[in-house]
Curated annotation (Swiss-Prot):
Its main location: cytoplasm. Binds 1 [4Fe-4S] cluster. The cluster is coordinated with 3 cysteines and an exchangeable S-adenosyl-L-methionine. Disulfide bonds join 127-370. This is Dual-specificity RNA methyltransferase RlmN. The gene is rlmN. It is found in: Cytoplasm. The active site is at 114 (proton acceptor), 370 (s-methylcysteine intermediate). The lineage of its organism: Bacteria, Pseudomonadati, Pseudomonadota, Gammaproteobacteria, Lysobacterales. It comes from Xanthomonas campestris pv. campestris (strain ATCC 33913 / DSM 3586 / NCPPB 528 / LMG 568 / P 25). GO terms for cellular component: cytoplasm. GO terms for biological process: rRNA base methylation; tRNA methylation. S-adenosyl-L-methionine binds at residues 187-188, 219, 241-243, 327. Reaction proceeds by a ping-pong mechanism involving intermediate methylation of a conserved cysteine residue. It is an enzyme of class 2 (transferase). Residues 120-365 form the Radical SAM core domain.
Length: 401
């Protein structure tokens, strides 16, 4: 047998080790973090609790600054983990106190989403996105015009809360400036179910942001099977984008209604309340558009639907209505209803004993009002040039540093 001789030069060539995958700890809720510490790091589970507090209470992302962790544990974390938060491309305050952040998603600089903070008397609400874009094609929504790109990760969802809470100086259980979170930003939350539910778990965890379940609201256009699943996995407040009380009109506004018509949607909402004893009502959102869905007959149809819902749940005020004046955006064919029509619509509902509120328009001077959220997706938005200039400017500053 011939002997195979390996040239010595080949023996000297270093073999590059496979890159170690690092776990972004923002992707994990308490249970996931406990498993990571026990199974991957071989550490006690309580260490996960310490790290959660550092990340979500003190907004620390550098393991070396987590001073109650031993040197050996910090070395393990550097090797196996990281804390990656969204990059703030720019932030805009509104004249009414509303604040909007444009956050870059991913490392390629092609995707971004918007997050909005809305202060009010005694409360501060953060509107959080769940997807880059949206694929449901609701005809009156700005986000729908850009199409759907992808789901956000858990880290990208909870990262929005992290960015806002850090900016606000929020201290859970002490100096709470962020009191409510609404999953009403870009995207349909129930189409990104697992990541959204995991992120909401961190929002409600005392080691996270410590929000009561009733102060976290998920808004859906009406994916009936996922509403049923949500009832078994979470007890957050539920809001439904209704916008019409008859199927013909709703199908023209919310195409999803063709698959899940109003009767099926209302039945699933009733099941949600029956299976969730901590929740006693569902909020039905109704965007008022001039000459489209703001006539007295539309109000009477909505009043009848709410009474039927109360009867199905066997509870008064099980259905609450939130009237939203339409917020115009470039290219839309819809107009906002006049103040007279809005008040007349509300009066019909109130006279029918339907608990009804009119949402005050906030942040429309910075395109942060409801329905105006529209982050960059590839090359399809009017702010793409500004987005790219900002990123290029940041890169130049980093290179010069």
């Amino acid at each position: 047998m011939n002997e195979v001789v390996i040239p010595s030069v080949l023996l000297d060539v270093p073999v590059s080790a496979a890159p170690v995958h690092k776990q972004n700890l923002l992707d994990l809720d308490r249970e996931g973090l406990e498993h990571f510490f026990a199974d991957t790091l071989g550490e006690a589970r309580y260490r996960a609790h310490q790290v959660m507090k550092w990340i979500h209470h003190r907004y620390v992302t550098d393991f070396d600054q987590m001073t109650d962790l031993g040197k050996a544990l910090r070395a393990k974390l550097h090797q196996h983990a990281e804390v990656l938060v969204p990059n703030v491309v720019f932030d805009k305050p509104s004249t009414d106190g509303t604040h909007k952040w444009l956050l870059a998603m991913g490392t390629d600089g092609k995707n971004a989403i918007e997050t909005v903070y809305i202060p009010d008397k005694g409360r501060g609400t953060l509107c959080v996105s769940s997807q880059v874009g949206c694929g449901l094609n609701c005809t009156f929504c700005s986000t729908a015009t850009q199409g759907f790109n992808r789901n956000l990760t858990t880290a990208e969802i909870i990262g929005q809360v992290w960015v806002a809470a850090r900016h606000l100086g929020n201290v859970p259980h002490q100096q709470r400036r962020l009191t409510n979170v609404v999953m009403m930003g870009m995207g349909e939350p129930l189409m990104n179910f697992d990541n959204v539910v995991r992120a909401m778990s961190v929002m409600r965890d005392d080691l996270g942001y410590g929000l009561a379940s009733k102060r976290v609201t998920l808004s859906t256009s009406g994916l009936v099977p996922m509403i049923d699943r949500l009832a078994t996995e979470s007890d957050v407040s539920l809001a439904v984008s209704l916008h019409a009380a008859n199927d013909v009109l709703r199908e023209s506004l919310v195409p999803l209604n063709k698959k899940y018509p109003i009767a099926e949607l209302m039945e699933s909402c009733a099941r949600y309340l029956r299976g969730n004893k901590k929740r006693d009502s569902v909020t039905f959102e109704y965007t008022l558009m001039k000459g489209i869905n703001d006539q007295p007959e539309h109000a009477r149809q909505l009043a009848r639907l709410m009474r039927q819902f109360d009867n199905a749940v066997q509870s008064k005020d099980a259905g609450k209505v939130n009237l939203i004046p339409f917020n115009p955006f470039p290219g839309t064919r819809y107009e906002r209803s006049g103040e007279t029509e809005i008040r007349a619509f509300q009066k019909i509902l109130l006279d029918a004993q339907v608990l009804t509120m009119v949402r005050r328009t906030r942040g429309d001077d910075i395109d942060a009002a409801c329905g105006q959220l529209k982050g960059q997706v590839m090359d399809r938005t009017r702010r793409q040039a500004e987005f790219r200039r900002t990123l290029e400017g940041q890169a130049d500053r980093d290179a010069a540093a």
